[in-house]
Swiss-Prot record:
<feature type="modified residue" description="Phosphoserine">
    <location>
        <position position="1327"/>
    </location>
</feature>
<comment type="function">
    <text>May play a role in the regulation of RhoA GTPase by guanine nucleotide-binding alpha-12 (GNA12) and alpha-13 (GNA13). Acts as guanine nucleotide exchange factor (GEF) for RhoA GTPase and may act as GTPase-activating protein (GAP) for GNA12 and GNA13.</text>
</comment>
<feature type="modified residue" description="Phosphoserine">
    <location>
        <position position="309"/>
    </location>
</feature>
<feature type="compositionally biased region" description="Polar residues">
    <location>
        <begin position="631"/>
        <end position="640"/>
    </location>
</feature>
<dbReference type="GO" id="GO:0005085">
    <property type="term" value="F:guanyl-nucleotide exchange factor activity"/>
</dbReference>
<dbReference type="InterPro" id="IPR015212">
    <property type="entry name" value="RGS-like_dom"/>
</dbReference>
<dbReference type="Pfam" id="PF09128">
    <property type="entry name" value="RGS-like"/>
</dbReference>
<feature type="compositionally biased region" description="Polar residues">
    <location>
        <begin position="330"/>
        <end position="344"/>
    </location>
</feature>
<feature type="region of interest" description="Disordered">
    <location>
        <begin position="247"/>
        <end position="346"/>
    </location>
</feature>
<feature type="modified residue" description="Phosphothreonine">
    <location>
        <position position="736"/>
    </location>
</feature>
<dbReference type="InterPro" id="IPR001478">
    <property type="entry name" value="PDZ"/>
</dbReference>
<keyword id="KW-0963">Cytoplasm</keyword>
<feature type="domain" description="RGSL">
    <location>
        <begin position="367"/>
        <end position="558"/>
    </location>
</feature>
<feature type="compositionally biased region" description="Polar residues">
    <location>
        <begin position="293"/>
        <end position="309"/>
    </location>
</feature>
<keyword id="KW-0007">Acetylation</keyword>
<feature type="compositionally biased region" description="Basic and acidic residues">
    <location>
        <begin position="28"/>
        <end position="45"/>
    </location>
</feature>
<feature type="coiled-coil region">
    <location>
        <begin position="194"/>
        <end position="262"/>
    </location>
</feature>
Amino acid sequence: MSGTQSTITDRFPLKKPIRHGSILNRESPTDKKQKVERIASHDFDPTDSSSKKTKSSSEESRSEIYGLVQRCVIIQKDDNGFGLTVSGDNPVFVQSVKEDGAAMRAGVQTGDRIIKVNGTLVTHSNHLEVVKLIKSGSYVALTVQGRPPGSPQIPLADSEVEPSVIGHMSPIMTSPHSPGASGNMERITSPVLMGEENNVVHNQKVEILRKMLQKEQERLQLLQEDYNRTPAQRLLKEIQEAKKHIPQLQEQLSKATGSAQDGAVVTPSRPLGDTLTVSEAETDPGDVLGRTDCSSGDASRPSSDNADSPKSGPKERIYLEENPEKSETIQDTDTQSLVGSPSTRIAPHIIGAEDDDFGTEHEQINGQCSCFQSIELLKSRPAHLAVFLHHVVSQFDPATLLCYLYSDLYKHTNSKETRRIFLEFHQFFLDRSAHLKVSVPDEMSADLEKRRPELIPEDLHRHYIQTMQERVHPEVQRHLEDFRQKRSMGLTLAESELTKLDAERDKDRLTLEKERTCAEQIVAKIEEVLMTAQAVEEDKSSTMQYVILMYMKHLGVKVKEPRNLEHKRGRIGFLPKIKQSMKKDKEGEEKGKRRGFPSILGPPRRPSRHDNSAIGRAMELQKARHPKHLSTPSSVSPEPQDSAKLRQSGLANEGTDAGYLPANSMSSVASGASFSQEGGKENDTGSKQVGETSAPGDTLDGTPRTLNTVFDFPPPPLDQVQEEECEVERVTEHGTPKPFRKFDSVAFGESQSEDEQFENDLETDPPNWQQLVSREVLLGLKPCEIKRQEVINELFYTERAHVRTLKVLDQVFYQRVSREGILSPSELRKIFSNLEDILQLHIGLNEQMKAVRKRNETSVIDQIGEDLLTWFSGPGEEKLKHAAATFCSNQPFALEMIKSRQKKDSRFQTFVQDAESNPLCRRLQLKDIIPTQMQRLTKYPLLLDNIAKYTEWPTEREKVKKAADHCRQILNYVNQAVKEAENKQRLEDYQRRLDTSSLKLSEYPNVEELRNLDLTKRKMIHEGPLVWKVNRDKTIDLYTLLLEDILVLLQKQDDRLVLRCHSKILASTADSKHTFSPVIKLSTVLVRQVATDNKALFVISMSDNGAQIYELVAQTVSEKTVWQDLICRMAASVKEQSTKPIPLPQSTPGEGDNDEEDPSKLKEEQHGISVTGLQSPDRDLGLESTLISSKPQSHSLSTSGKSEVRDLFVAERQFAKEQHTDGTLKEVGEDYQIAIPDSHLPVSEERWALDALRNLGLLKQLLVQQLGLTEKSVQEDWQHFPRYRTASQGPQTDSVIQNSENIKAYHSGEGHMPFRTGTGDIATCYSPRTSTESFAPRDSVGLAPQDSQASNILVMDHMIMTPEMPTMEPEGGLDDSGEHFFDAREAHSDENPSEGDGAVNKEEKDVNLRISGNYLILDGYDPVQESSTDEEVASSLTLQPMTGIPAVESTHQQQHSPQNTHSDGAISPFTPEFLVQQRWGAMEYSCFEIQSPSSCADSQSQIMEYIHKIEADLEHLKKVEESYTILCQRLAGSALTDKHSDKS
């Protein structure tokens, strides 16, 4: 190394060298001259080696001459590979570097020692592993050690390799064909070293030989490359000649270096001629050429195995002399201590980084460099894994690594222990209070919240384990990467030990034992690190220590648990089945838990308790037990200590081990003795004596004996005890064994939240119902009925168990904490909420269930449907729904407060621990008991479904199903409340983290509104990440919140949520920026899918600042679909809320009976679905306050069969229009899925504003013609109309004279069809008409006089009348009123097929006027769009265009109205008689009565006022359509511009 070189004064002392004569000097004066020149040119100082011996002098001179430096190079792979060849093992050297190759350009030199590859230390790796690392990518970073750039080449090995090896590694540059070189070769003889000066001469001669050899090798490589490109005989001869020279040089170099070895004797084996003969016989030219890459630098490959063994030199030299040609492919032949046959030593020792045949070699795995590349490899190496664990424990949070290892431990555990391992895994890593909590997927977390861990089936165990292992694997790999970097810098533990293990790694038993022994020492160091943890982290450290020790045991490492860990193991796992490390403890535990009968046969523990010594004594003990139950609380108060001890041993086992008995033993009916054997753990300690368990009321209602002591619960009523005694006597009569009764205690007296689970587990199943009834009764029942009774029995008993759990929560926690004043009243409400209400509801439900059982004396419950409906529907449903929603929605806050208070308040923590240690909690924590209410609600529909499944009577089954549906409604209501509460909690957190400091007034005019944004005042609907694609080159990662009326686009920065405005330069206006608001109001939103990306969607907002189009990209297609659906739904909901229907005057009582068009209101009242409830995902833009959307409802008649026919045709029409809509959407452009027209064609075939104006004209005609109300009805109905400002209340003098112009404008805008005007002219128009062209000013609108009504009726539209449509007559035929006008479009008459000339199929998309009670609805369009008349007015006019065109209103409204111009004698294609019969005759059955004009003048005036306002809005809507068309054209042009720029 360069650090070991001498200083200048050391290298040049004052003493001059004294040269003695030598054979070499006397024979070769020329050589002496060359030697002096060489010394001068390389700063060679012979005095440095004058006092050294032969071996040391050689090494020191090399070190002095060639100072080694370490450097890092980066090689970029080119077409010819990396351009270098490596050789050697431990370490690996650069064998050769291609001329002008990638390695040479990077600065790699022949002879460089490779230290690291991509940061991985490879000094102890073989060349196969190094090549694999180099070839792993298109570039590689090498840390190499070698001569400084520009200095002469040096041997491949450094000073740690012996001189005898150096002679075979150093390339030389002198050509053997030069005169000087040939002369040197001829004069060189075996050196005779006489004195210290001759060592210098000898070294110089060796150097010359090396350079000659290297030059010849390089020449050979060039010749072979030329031969490969252009084979020629001349090149082949030169190659053979070079191959002859190389062995000669190697032989001389071997002799020169061999004489310097201590005790080395060179014995030539045969002349060179023989050698060449052998090589030619063994290897043909093809073979020689085939090994070009492997033979380019055959003079180097040191081996650490025998580099210090001088005896290996002669053996290798003998082999070289025998096989000189094959020695080209055998690198560093003198470094192998054992010489094998030639065929076994050729291929594996040299390989180039670009060698394509590398993959076929047998790949060796070196422990040090390879096992740390992957955790999978590391798991089988105990010592290496222990070092890695030490590194992670010392530097990081080891939770993810320990989670991964414990998951692996589960996979390698036998089936008997997997449940225990999973429970520990859940407690360590998945539980909310886990000390080593890791990130758990949301779905899995929600599933775990609903299940009790010990009741989860094994297939889910494996799924959860695999999921968690995959989730933490990336983090483990990051730890491994950090470890590799630290290890390369020498910052890790036990490096020398691992190096030795890697060198001896043969995977034999001895090596594995050494690894385990080494791992024991490293584990001890890990424990030392854990011991230094703070007191607050003691539990976490103990858990970490336990996990590490368990996994090390799995690997066979002998570890001893510290004393402080042994006594904690019972608390670490859920079950007492965890094996104890000390045999005595285990035996003691078994003695206390499993040897039940010896303790039973002993003396009783207390006089008040009884043992379960034999089944025959059960009745005597039962009789002796009841007086105790009926005693006062004071009579049992002296025994709390013993009863607690007794229950501690029994309940603990029942709540845990009992759950693991086979399921078939639970349901076995034939033998109660089998129950006793299977449940031996419960029989032993006397916790479930036979006499106790034979009374279900005692245990199920809260174990009154115990609760009297602890809770002061009232004793069970006498009738209850008598009922239970009767049940016991009934069972005893028929000889059923008693032990089955103990399951009463197991499942309901001592257990808990197993009610909330529906696994076939011992604790979940109630006592077998078949044991409660006589044998004769059972024989008279069908198997289906027996199943039904069992499910009913389970419903009753699990309800008892739930009541007991709620009482535990109330008495053990709530009452005590309130008495002791540990929490304030507000904190009590936050944690326990309305616990009293919940408890009373379930107590009442339990009492009603008991009453049902009492009235069925044979325990066979026949009818239960009515009772279930009473409990779960009507008032009972409402009470339970609201109470449970209040309690359960508070659950997230309660659990969070418990967690935070336990950390901050030591008094509260002590209380909780003390309460949870109460045996009545059955080892459940407070955080486990609170969710039991939610879990109970999930059980009801399942049980009721099972009851219905086994019910044979149809009426009864329907009642039970209906009750089950009500239970689901309760559950859904509560789930929604819980979700909203959780969302509210998250919104509060988001509001706390919201950062509005980036908002600037210059960027966005409404910045103050954004700064004052309060998320907590809204409800959150959805949230998640989205990517905002601003343009082709700019994307922004967003965290998006969908609230009830806005969409908020946030950016995550650290822990903040930043609200920031972004700008974009539009292609059409390159000189200005368009600023996008991060808050989008849903009342202005239209959503469309992006045609070119199925994960993206357009959110188009029409704000006060203009149109804003956001392209948002989701992570998956399903997520995009969810976002699109929710945004559409919420936008529709916001628009619906902002619009109210206009009430119309009610009909007289006599005419109300004949009204056929009342379904909208009827449906609203009956089904709770608003007229605009069904929303289409394709919404039109509108302002934030006005526009709503609604699909037309298929209104049905309440009493007539005509409704079915009409609904059928309405459904067909809707389907056809939806198909047309889908087809329209499919024809959108490539960049925008909006109907963007071509610039040279009309924008749209349908003009919704014109349609609306046309329909408004028809509405006006209808009202003017038919509406007449009495003064009384006007006064009654006036309350339905809100008060509005009127533009003009004066008499209207102008008649409606321009309806034909309205029709003309409509036709020219929508159909582009020629039509006949009043004068008979044919007019065709392709451009949209402006309002001034089509309509008169507003003040010209007035009521038509009576004598002009006939002409008003003549104003009809080709689009309304469809000649091709058949006549759909209602029952009773079509009367003169022509009521089809109010039916679906398909109901129009076909009596006049010749009328309406110029009509087309497209005209079938008519607008139907429906008068439904107090509401007027215009329908007939598919996607829905509403427009409000004013911010104060909510319109009931529902306009439904085919595709979404934004409807925007502004303060500047130009108001027009359609009018009629038939006064000029124009000929109409429709006669008044036909119109009256077909269109307006329906008024006989409507809610209106034709009155004289004088009687309804006020009403007509008010209606006309509303119509004027509608007209104004629709006129503006038409203008907006035109503006929107221009905007779409601009966007289309921008998209085309972007496309062309992309292509260019």
